[in-house]
Amino acid sequence: PHPTPTPPFSTRRFPPLQVRIHGSGETLLPVGRSLVANVQQTSDNGRVHNLGTSVPFEVKTLVTPSVLRNQYNWPESAKGKHGSSQAVAEFYGEFFSNHDLDSFFNEINEPQQSIAQANVKGNLANDQDHAGGEASLDVQYLMGMAPEVPTYFYSYSDLNPYTPENEGFLTWLVTMGGEQNPPLVHSLSYGDVEADVFNSTNGAAPYAARVDLEFAKLSARGMSIIVASGDDGSAGFLARNDPMSGCSHAAPEWPASSPYVTTVGATQLATDGSSTYEIVCSAREGGVITSGGGFSDIYSRPVWQKDAVQAYLKNGVGVPKASFFNASGRAYPDITALGSRFLVFVDGAQVELSGTSASTPVVAAMISLFNDARLGAGLPPMGHVAPFLYQTAVSHPNAFTDISEGSIACLSGSPETVTCCDDSFGATKGWDATSGLGSPKFDQLLKIALDTGKKQDLKQNFKHAAKLVQSRRSTQAEALEPHSA
């Protein structure tokens, strides 16, 4: 089966910040691999069906940085001042254009920032004449939401040597691990089918385990890896390849399912006529894509999310039948944010993009600004963010907006033709497998992140990451060396 790349979301533009290109090749999300579902299917068992028509109260306003700031109580004054840094990782030959960045900032009325000449490293130069949707989306919204935070562009042509249709994440991670001061926050909008990545018949599993080791090592150094949850609901690419049988069991995505990263889902705006609110992003409701989520078939549930996930399973609302998923696995997403109908400039044109590829750089930018504030207060960076989020949901539940409407039963596509599964996960009060802990309230989370009492909590997160490194090393005596395709 093909990997499940997370497609770019709504259009977006970023202010021209200091962008440096690293790696063996400039690439971004594989825009050439369409994630839009145009297939109508029915099954003799009723497992797959087309549900037609979109929700009558869909909000079609394009999402821009100002919309995001208003939605999440995110002040315009939040900018980089104290040494924070951030980056995007791109594969499959995605490029971005500085001209598009300029156009984006002009469109959103943001003051343009001076941009240093991009430092291109590797075997692929940034082909600005062929800017792609994924790269443009990632760079524009990471920079647009975290102004004046130095931003880096890591691009690679490498592929997984065992499953060459998948990304070569290891080269990227080892490159960062070898840097003295790598960026503190990394936004990753790519994903593959977990079962393919951990295929025991082709030797791929040790490669994935080595990638996890590098994730854990970076977390132990204070870095945050923010990953998109996917754009084809809970059944993912398996249902797209074989709708008749693909809906019989959830198809977790990786590295979204990894406990060593923080995973981001997507929401869309809806209205009841008097107010606008967020619901789970679903193609059936006009959201273009359906946010990914579910439970890993490989990883056991980490202790930091045990109580939240167990409450969801015990409640039973929005929980599919037991045979559909691994109820003891690592559950995702951890958090969510708007990911439908983003305004983006691509190759000189203003376009609209949707996906968890949009919500992920938004959350990554938020963490970059939290880091900047912490560094200014003499505190360490956030590191692995997921444990902090779950701790905060217990101590300060109002720091999140609970998303209690929607499901992830469908693939991506148009409301009239999208394929949907009968079994899936639904939204409910508290953590759920469609939207995690909910969407963030920037102002409240920032205050909590700056709370001096959290300094010790984050140190505990670092210690936890260090233990994970030791554990991974003990099981990976023959750790693979990075492979360049």
Where do the protein language model's features map onto the residues?
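Hydrophobic/aromatic hotspots within intrinsically disordered, low-complexity regions
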Residues: F9, L35, F462, L468-V469, ...
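Substrate-binding/charge-relay-adjacent region of secreted/lumenal peptidase catalytic domains
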Residues: P1-T263, S296-S354, R374-A377, L437-K454
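Long, low-complexity, intrinsically disordered segments
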Residues: K467-A485
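Polar, glycine-rich mid-to-C-terminal structural blocks
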Residues: P259, T263-Q305
